[in-house]
């Protein structure tokens, strides 16, 4: 049995869960998320209103989907109650970010500004020209848009310039030595 998969999922008060066949819908104070569960995995309401994820047998695919499904549903519940946020920082001379409505516009040393549109359900908050955050209720979307922004100008190993996640440690390389 998957150690993660066999743990029941606690449902906090204020969260409404609807199970319709293979579709699980989670509604909370911050919004609604839905997920389609892969075919052999079943989600049921157990005792004390907790959710239980079960698999029919121990085939390799079913074992891997078991823990994954449980974690995805737990992330949905946390998303609609607390939400997710990734803080990011910009290092480098002249590198900055500014809010343009609900979107962001980056100056990253290119000859043109780089715009980033906020997908549905994602909000950007600019704290300073070099610090901003990405937040939303869907953990996957928050991580995906953060990775796209990070990829616009990855941290340089020689000078450390670029966009980083808050707390990210950039391994620095030693430059060439002159004669």
Swiss-Prot record:
Give TM segment ranges: none
Q: Name one GO molecular function term.
A: structural constituent of ribosome
Any Gene Ontology biological process? cytoplasmic translation
Please give the Pfam families that the UniProt record associates with this protein. Answer: Ribosomal_L6
Q: Which UniProt keywords apply?
A: Ribonucleoprotein, Ribosomal protein, RNA-binding, rRNA-binding
Q: Which SUPFAM superfamilies match?
A: Ribosomal protein L6
Alphabetical list of Gene3D superfamilies matching this protein? Ribosomal protein L6, alpha-beta domain
Q: Which InterPro entries match?
A: Ribosomal_uL6-like, Ribosomal_uL6-like_a/b-dom_sf, Ribosomal_uL6_a/b-dom, Ribosomal_uL6_bac-type, Ribosomal_uL6_CS
GO CC terms of this entry: cytosolic large ribosomal subunit
Q: Which domain of life is it from?
A: Bacteria
- Subunit info? Part of the 50S ribosomal subunit.
Q: What does this protein do?
A: This protein binds to the 23S rRNA, and is important in its secondary structure. It is located near the subunit interface in the base of the L7/L12 stalk, and near the tRNA binding site of the peptidyltransferase center.
In which family does this protein belong, per the annotation? Belongs to the universal ribosomal protein uL6 family.
| PANTHER family assigned to the protein according to its UniProt record, in alphabetical order | 60S/50S RIBOSOMAL PROTEIN L6/L9, LARGE RIBOSOMAL SUBUNIT PROTEIN UL6M
Query: This protein is called what?
Result: Large ribosomal subunit protein uL6
**Provenance organism:** Nocardia farcinica (strain IFM 10152)
């Amino acid at each position: 049995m998957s150690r993660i998969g066999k743990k029941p999922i606690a449902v906090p008060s204020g969260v409404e869960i609807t199970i319709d066949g293979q579709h699980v819908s989670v509604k909370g104070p911050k919004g609604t998320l839905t997920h389609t569960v892969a075919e052999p995995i079943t989600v049921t309401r157990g005792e004390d209103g907790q959710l239980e994820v079960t698999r029919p047998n121990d085939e390799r695919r079913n074992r891997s989907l078991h823990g994954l499904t449980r974690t995805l549903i737990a992330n949905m519940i946390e998303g609609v109650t607390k939400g997710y946020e990734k803080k990011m920082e910009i290092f480098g001379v002249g590198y900055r970010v500014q809010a343009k409505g609900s979107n962001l516009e980056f100056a990253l040393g290119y000859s043109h500004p780089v715009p980033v549109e906020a997908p549905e359900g994602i909000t950007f908050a600019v704290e300073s020209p070099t610090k901003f955050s990405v937040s939303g209720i869907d953990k996957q979307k928050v991580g995906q848009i953060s990775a796209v922004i990070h990829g616009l100008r990855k941290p340089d190993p020689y000078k450390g310039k670029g966009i980083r996640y808050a707390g990210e440690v950039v391994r620095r390389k030693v430059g060439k030595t002159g004669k």
